[in-house]
């Protein structure tokens, strides 16, 4: 999954969630931090389509079609990985971090491309786990 607002030097959100779950380290997430996750496949499809279009120029932003907060996203990732009782791994730090919104306006591209932004369910379906996550 690709999330806006993540520092380049950091691992991506789903890798961080999975790594901490494997080591049974509590995962700090913010219920007040909204993001629009997109799959790398969806972004690649958009990039390919943009390279084939001579009529579109400029800087564009792309993200998933729906917003989700970090807590819910971490829960869904752990649930998809086959972790029982995912909530037991999550610690809400919204009181410390406050309200953050990484929402992106997709309107400049949305109606110009054949490729559509994926909703959260479709984005998470592209996040494959070949076998249940092993915990240490």
Question: Where do the protein language model's features map onto the residues?
Answer:
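Short, surface-exposed alpha-helical segments at coil->helix boundaries
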Residues: 11-15, 71, 75, 103
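Glycine-rich Rossmann NAD(P)(H)-binding loop
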Residues: 4, 28-34, 60-67, 112
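Mid/C-terminal beta-alpha module of Rossmann-like enzyme folds, strongest
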Residues: 46, 53-100, 135-136
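NAD(P)-dependent short-chain dehydrogenase/reductase
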Residues: 1-35, 42
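C-terminal amphipathic/interface module of NAD(P)-dependent oxidoreductases
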Residues: 84, 97-136
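Amphipathic alpha-helical segments that line or abut small-molecule/effector binding pockets
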Residues: 18, 41-49, 125
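Amphipathic alpha-helical segment in the mid-to-C-terminal domain
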Residues: 40, 70, 116-120
